[in-house]
């Protein structure tokens, strides 16, 4: 066995010219952007607007938020349950602006009208239920309801014609299933412990006003890689580190035209996921040096963090190990051992709910490492087999997998099928066949797939599932499905300015554009490579 530093990267002798060009352009673009290609967040921008109205660009942010209110009065993307938190966030921010009179250049009448419509939307939304498993929604939503109701108690709000009826009427009820007291209980636990745990930093805005001066300044200036958490810290925190935090917030605003994403930078996540996606059809030779450099920079023997200020996690650690192996420079998967939880991996230490996709990535990482270093012992092979069996047990009765990091089951199912496809045995093959059957049954007439409507990103995942199922290779049904899907992917790749909708979970939905585009480019190349 040759040294691991001399393993060849998985390149293919022949790629289509368009794939080589598109992959090279994408890798170059990502390499030149230290922040990450993700649209700004309505939720996050509204939180910064509320907590830091003094920050340059305040009226720009207000105008942008007003423009994004739907005809129904709500804000946000996706189905109704996903719109609760963005609507709470913007409604509170606009009420705060009205109370503090911080936007002389924005019509108070327009602000009040938007609040009126937002409150009406919230009255209808609150009883919906079925809330998504997004980051700390059980803390963030109740806190915002309390803040909104406090605003409605104030005389300066009651004096506004559009809002007087709300001020004199009933207050917003807590959304179905949420507890008004939970933010207080979380804050009390932090006070007893003498500090705020790292896992709460990213969503610190939900407890900040209950924990003044409880979090010291953080290296890099952004608390938990979150502009909202940082703005909340600036409003409630100590004097030390304030200049650094303001500088960091200002830099994010400059990158995103005065607005804010929910996590920044996302370069670790973006570069790892893009590397693995582009490796499926084989890395173009021109991309290998850059991807190798990314993997070397990101890999950390103590575990990889998705962004500065976040906890190390299985997902990013596994993807760093996997990307290293796929780029021909395998690195030891031992950092994953910190996340072992019996027969699977916790996504991070102290996790409340498990993740099938993080475990799928861990399985891929272990499999890739063992393919390079099969003599590394029985322990890793046993851990790999445990993870495989746990993953098989998570498959649902319809053949799909579902996960908390993504709204679409096509993502989770593709990750699990891809991880399992390198393993033999009737149980594994049956699971993959069941997943592919589910995919075939769900294709739309236009050739796309999607949980809420067809998207190119989800179509790429569905294509990978079908291509990984040996029982569907060459069947008329799969062949026709892939032919239709190829048209969908080609249109997304070659149409100018294609926008991938928000499907990923953070505090609300978000859309990592470059990552989704890599999936689409790679899936299209796999389909085109099948033709003689």
From Swiss-Prot:
Q: What does the UniProt keyword field contain?
A: Isomerase, Magnesium, Metal-binding
Positions occupied by motif DXDDTA motif: 313-318
Q: Which Pfam families match?
A: SQHop_cyclase_C (PF13243)
Q: Name one GO biological process term.
A: diterpenoid biosynthetic process
What's the catalysed reaction?
A: (2E,6E,10E)-geranylgeranyl diphosphate = (+)-copalyl diphosphate
Motif, QXXDGSW motif: chain positions = 443-449
Q: Which InterPro entries would you find in this protein's record? A: SQ_cyclase_C (IPR032696), Terpene_synthase-like (IPR050148), Terpenoid_cyclase/PrenylTrfase (IPR008930)
**Is-annotated flag, keyword Magnesium?**
yes
GO MF terms held by the record: copalyl diphosphate synthase activity; magnesium ion binding; terpene synthase activity
- Name the needed cofactors: Mg(2+)
Q: Which SUPFAM superfamilies match?
A: Terpenoid cyclases/Protein prenyltransferases
N-terminal signal peptide: none
Supply the Gene3D superfamilies for this chain: 1.50.10.160, 1.50.10.20
Q: Name the enzyme's class.
A: isomerase
State its Enzyme Commission number(s): 5.5.1.12
Entry domain remark: The Asp-Xaa-Asp-Asp-Thr-Ala (DXDDTA) and Gln-Xaa-Xaa-Asp-Gly-Ser-Trp (QXXDGSW) motifs are expected to bind to Mg(2+).
Q: Which PANTHER family match?
A: (E,E)-GERANYLLINALOOL SYNTHASE, ENT-COPALYL DIPHOSPHATE SYNTHASE, CHLOROPLASTIC
Q: Into which family does the record put it?
A: Belongs to the terpene synthase family.
Per the entry, what this protein does is: Involved in the biosynthesis of the mercapturic acid derivative diterpene cyslabdan A, a potentiator of the beta-lactam antibiotic imipenem. Catalyzes the conversion of geranylgeranyl diphosphate (GGDP) into (+)-copalyl diphosphate.
Name the chain's protein. Copalyl diphosphate synthase
Q: Which organism is it from?
A: Streptomyces cyslabdanicus
UniProt gene name: cldB
